[in-house]
Curated annotation (Swiss-Prot):
InterPro entries: ARM-like, ARM-type_fold, Deoxyhypusine_hydroxylase, PBS_lyase_HEAT. It catalyses: [eIF5A protein]-deoxyhypusine + AH2 + O2 = [eIF5A protein]-hypusine + A + H2O. Its cofactor is Fe(2+). HEAT-like PBS-type repeats lie at residues 54-80, 87-113, 178-204, 209-235, 242-268. Catalyzes the hydroxylation of the N(6)-(4-aminobutyl)-L-lysine intermediate produced by deoxyhypusine synthase/DHPS on a critical lysine of the eukaryotic translation initiation factor 5A/eIF-5A. This is the second step of the post-translational modification of that lysine into an unusual amino acid residue named hypusine. Hypusination is unique to mature eIF-5A factor and is essential for its function. Gene3D superfamilies: Leucine-rich Repeat Variant. GO terms for molecular function: deoxyhypusine monooxygenase activity; iron ion binding. Its EC number is 1.14.99.29. The lineage of its organism: Eukaryota, Metazoa, Chordata, Craniata, Vertebrata. This is Deoxyhypusine hydroxylase.
Length: 305
């Protein structure tokens, strides 16, 4: 069991701007896995960083940890219009993931935010909290289990055929929450047919929606999605939030063609895309080596003594 001293040692790597971004990401994931108020405190301290990629990942981790001590930090990040939209969006999503209804009024306020990605995120988070408050987690009628350890912005839709779920996914007249439910139902199926249906979502009009498609394709890690992920990454006029998520998904799939694509974009002019490629390649290097675990902040500290 890690003590506060161990956590502080890993935390000091996370907040050290002189460290490589890849090393700091490893420290972040170590803190997420360790959990607890002290880990939350260290993660919260890194929101002053210049890297939007790192800050958005901080918010994501705080949401996944579901520790209510992170709520004040996440509220402050959501309110801070100097933070990049992708960071504010992730803070809003994390508040929904933690699931405490006390943030409902704040989320309703920011559901009207002038930044569309932030507004749509908060609309989804409001719907998720209302779903939780109505006992949604207790009633799992006809839905498939989430095979991943993620807290999602929407529950899966009830089990239907892939063509039916695809229709729900792509129907832009439906509320975003309902389309997200179809997205997570398709993800939970994880078949090639489901993956190809999800890939079609990369053509939809909402950048937030497209970036979430990239995220779930990264979770599934199915090679059938490589061409669509590559096409989105190569689209230079695509929203950087979408391109970065597609880069991370390619890294998650990790096949040789993915490595070649990531190598090509590790010098991209968009900082968040460039950094995503660097982090993804670092994760792949770990997976292809004999290193025991990616979130190895504590192991690295021990080997340095």
């Amino acid at each position: 069991m890690a003590n506060d001293k161990d956590i502080a040692a890993v935390g000091s790597i996370l907040v050290n701007t002189k460290q490589d971004l890849t090393t700091r990401f490893r420290a972040l994931f170590t803190l997420r896995n360790l959990g607890g108020a002290e880990a939350v405190k260290w993660i919260s301290e890194a929101f002053v960083d210049e890297s939007a990629l790192l800050k958005h990942e901080l918010a994501y981790c705080l949401g996944q940890m579901q520790d209510e001590s992170a709520i004040p930090t996440l509220e402050a990040v959501l309110k801070d219009t100097n933070q990049e939209p992708m960071v504010r969006h992730e803070a809003g999503e994390a508040l929904g993931a933690i699931g405490n209804p006390k943030v409902l009024e704040l989320l309703k306020k920011y559901a009207e935010d002038p930044v569309i990605e932030v507004a749509e995120t908060c609309q989804l988070a409001v719907k998720r909290l209302e779903w939780l408050m109505n006992g949604g987690e207790q009633t799992k009628d006809g839905t498939d289990e989430n095979p991943y350890c993620s807290v999602d912005p929407a529950p899966p839709a009830q089990r239907k055929s892939v063509p039916e779920l695809r229709t729900q996914l792509l129907d832009e007249t439906l509320p975003l929450f309902d389309r997200y439910r179809a997205m997570f139902a398709l993800r939970n199926l994880g078949t090639e047919e489901a993956v190809l249906a999800l890939g079609d979502g990369l053509q939809c009009s909402s950048a937030l929606f497209r970036h979430e498609i990239g995220y779930v394709l990264g979770q599934i890690q199915h090679e059938a999605s490589i061409p669509q992920l590559q096409a989105a990454l190569e689209k230079m006029d695509e929203n950087a939030m979408v391109r970065h998520e597609c880069a991370e998904a390619l890294g998650s799939i990790g096949k040789e063609p993915c490595v070649q694509i990531l190598e090509r974009y590790r010098k991209d002019q968009e900082r968040v895309v460039k950094e995503s490629c660097e982090v993804a390649l670092d994760m792949l290097e770990y997976e292809n080596s004999s290193q025991f675990q990616y979130a190895d902040g504590l192991l690295r500290l021990q080997s340095a003594h």
